[in-house]
Amino acid sequence: LAAVSVDCSEYPKPACTIEYRPLCGSDNKTYDNKCNFCNAVVESNGTLTLSHFGKC
């Protein structure tokens, strides 16, 4: 089983679009898109990871 991951190297960003492409974080929270998810990853100092694509 391949690990799912997202490249967050260009984050954090000051503003995210309203694009809806949900991702489920390891905190069992659904993030609206990659930008919102990656900003949360940066804020968590890398402790937050991607559980899977789609809603939790």
Curated annotation (Swiss-Prot):
Annotated glycan sites: N45
Gene3D superfamilies, per the entry: 3.30.60.30
InterPro entries recorded: Bifunctional_prot_inhibitor (IPR051597), Kazal_dom (IPR002350), Kazal_dom_sf (IPR036058), Prot_inh_Kazal-m (IPR001239)
Matches recorded under SMART domains: KAZAL
CDD domains for the chain: KAZAL_FS (cd00104)
GO annotations of cellular component type: extracellular space
Disulfide bridge map: C8-C38, C16-C35, C24-C56
GO molecular function: serine-type endopeptidase inhibitor activity
Keyword field contains Acyltransferase: no
Domain Kazal-like: 6-56
Signal peptide boundaries: none
Keywords, sorted A to Z: Disulfide bond, Glycoprotein, Protease inhibitor, Repeat, Secreted, Serine protease inhibitor
UniProt subcellular location: Secreted
Record's comment describing the protein's domains: Avian ovomucoid consists of three homologous, tandem Kazal family inhibitory domains.
Name of the protein in its database record: Ovomucoid
Source species: Lophura leucomelanos (Kalij pheasant)
